[in-house]
Amino acid sequence: MKKVNFTEMKKGTKKDYKILEKYDKKFERKTADRILKYLKSQTSTLEGYKITRLEHSLQAATRAFKNKESEEMVVATLLHDIGDDFAPMNHSQYAASIIKPYVSEKTFWIIHHHGLFQSYYSAHHLGGDRNARNKFKNHKYFKATINFCENYDQNSFDPNYKSMKLKQFAPMVKRIFSRKPFYFL
């Protein structure tokens, strides 16, 4: 394997960065595989709930698929809580940052804000403001985010629901993450 000559990026040459570009592209092509592997491992999280984190994601994505959402939205729904393990206080933003280069502004916004909107169902039971989402009431994706939470997220904790299998979503994930990125950084 070729390696760069620098120990500080400011001393890198065009040749060095061409070497890295080749490896970066190869790594980027495997993003979907790494995401699917991580999702598959989500079998022991969501303590206190009746289902696993993986099952919650599968239920939510199955509901989106059955509702004939775009493939982009189905994949975003599958990944909407992928940030819970690493960023429990801002999991929505974490998940949104993963999908941002490959999805529309609308899909990004929904996933980015779903955590706050989802608190509508629980905040008032814990001394919080269930209507905190209303600060976005004039935003063009406000209703779409409410619909996302109502139709796919808040109702996907059912141990008796028949979800699609992760392998059924795998080709969709691979197609979305093989798109030419809409955004970079």
Q: Where would I find each of the regions flagged by the language model?
A:
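Metal-dependent phosphohydrolase cores
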Residues: M1-L78, I82-L185
